[in-house]
Design a protein with these regions (language model features):
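Structured cytosolic domains appended to multi-pass membrane proteins
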Residues: 1-118
Length: 118
């Protein structure tokens, strides 16, 4: 969902994943991204409300990030808890997005996104 981010810089989109990132949530995530039609320059995937992520979530995230990168979209991750971040590291997703594109909170990610979208 993108609620609460009315004043996003041009070219920046925030997608908040809410709840466990597993099989059911993955379909919604993919559908929502497909529905945007125009690619943002920067997509912030906000993981603050994700208590855990399973293998399906990890695989989907990896595929989505790869697809977005091919389309020239910079992907930033924000707010993942230690457990989720550990899984993202082990799955190679942190390396895929780049350590410099992982942020503790959405405010820091938005600052970086504003610069990256220019």
């Amino acid at each position: 969902s993108h609620r609460g981010f009315a004043n996003l810089p041009p070219g920046v989109l925030v997608y908040a994943v809410e709840g466990p990132f597993f099989f059911g949530a993955v379909e919604t995530f993919e559908r929502t991204l497909a529905a945007t039609h125009t690619d943002p320059r920067v997509l912030i995937i906000r993981l603050r409300w994700v208590p855990f992520i399973d293998i399906t979530g990890l695989q989907t995230l990896e595929e989505v990030v790869g697809d977005l990168h091919k389309r020239g979209v910079t992907v930033l991750l924000s707010g993942a808890n230690e457990r989720v971040l550990g899984k993202l590291r082990r799955a190679g997703i942190v390396a895929q997005v780049g350590e410099e594109n992982v942020f503790g909170d959405v405010a820091a990610a938005l600052q970086a996104a504003t610069v990256a979208a220019r």
